[in-house]
Amino acid sequence: MVQADPAGAGGLKRRLGLFDAVTIGLGAMIGAGIFAALAPAAGAAGSGLLPALAGAAVVAYCNATSSARLAARYPASGGTYVYGRERLGAFWGYLAGWGFVVGKTASCAAMALTVGLYVWPGQAHAVAAAAVVALTAVNYAGVRKSAWLTRALVAVVLAVLTVVVTVCLTSRAADPVRLDPGAGATAGGVLQAAGLLFFAFAGYARIATLGEEVRDPARTIPRAVPVALGITLVVYAAVAVAALAVLGPTRLAGAAAPLAEAVRAAGTPELVPLVRAGAAAAALGSLLALILGVSRTTLAMARDRHLPAVLAAVHPRFHVPHRAELAVGAVVAVLAATADVRAAIGFSSFGVLAYYAVANAAALTLTAAEHRPPRAIPVIGLAGCLVLAFALPATAVVAGAAVLAAGAAAYGVRAARGSA
């Protein structure tokens, strides 16, 4: 059984309650889905965007349930890296952790670039790198400050999205005919869109990876995960309906800033600056929570010597994995200077779907005494993760599989040397 290190012995300090955990998950999910994944998903699914959203939500719910039960059983930082290791063996835990770290590092770059593209399109890469540096400093100063800032960002974003949905759905430009999922949608396109939209739902992983910093994790994590996921699904569905109603799938797919285009089409161009500000706030919230979660999984893997042991240090004053956070921040800052947003989303989705496939497989091994979920939930989650992963664009599948294979090969080399 995994034991969380006590805060006074090199471990992390339990500061987060239910509301903090929910807002960290919301901050990670809402920014990613609404402002980054909606347009490419519409491009893949066309008029089948809403069924794709529903499919992604089903898989996300199964993953969330499996993750919550496992997190209650193993309340240590690392998420599925820990669950896979304890339930399936060291290799599967390592593979899950590797998929999470590389996939979510790509997510960080995508969110940083989203900030840059909305704040200052002509200097997007510079703004993205600056955002990474600033938020890494916030996380370094302590997770409690991160939780408060995330709470403020979530409130701003939800207010902006409420305005967008209201304006679009009450506009004369809204046409319910555009919501018909039967016009030109294909099964392959819907599955690919679901895989891209899954990128948006994956924020609840941040709640599980904060296992050592949540008060009463056995109760808090299983409650926080479905609450955050449910709120996010309602928000996504409302925004997707509003955007489709005024733009239609073709125009939505081609929009560089789809929600800004939606309010313009609804006859309220004066709201475009507000939407751009909301997009930047959403992406900042996602980036803040992403850096937080990736650094905690890096910490867990470093403790087990699957990553350099120097990254396992916890700051004696701030009680955060400061070296892991600085390393993650440095890598993301470099990627933000070179990455393409849409390619990063596909790559990230593949890695994170692999991560949750391991989580569902691990949940299948829980006993009734360990509060095992109904068997259908991890089975559907596992199958759904595999189907959506290989339905992604070919470049994302090839790149993601290659990186996972490289990680597996590195593990094999270490095992052969007797150090795995």
Roles of regions detected by a PLM:
Residues 40-43, 52, 61-140, 154, ...:
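Hydrophobic transmembrane alpha-helices that form the core helical bundles
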Residues 1, 5-6, 85, 111-127, ...:
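Helix-loop-helix connectors at the membrane interface of multi-pass transporters/channels
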Residues 135, 149-152, 311-322, 353-399, ...:
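C-terminal membrane-solvent junction of multi-pass transporters and transport-like membrane proteins
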Residues 1-37, 44-48, 60-61, 65, ...:
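Membrane-interface "cap" regions at the ends of multi-pass membrane proteins
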Residues 82-83, 89, 121, 226-291, ...:
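TM-loop-TM module centered on a large, flexible mid-protein loop between adjacent transmembrane helices
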Residues 34-38, 111, 138-143, 252, ...:
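Transmembrane helix-loop junctions in multi-pass membrane proteins
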Residues 116, 123-174, 181-187, 225-229, ...:
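Membrane-interface loop-to-helix entry segments
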Residues 2-12, 50, 54, 151-277, ...:
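Helix-loop-helix junctions that connect adjacent transmembrane segments
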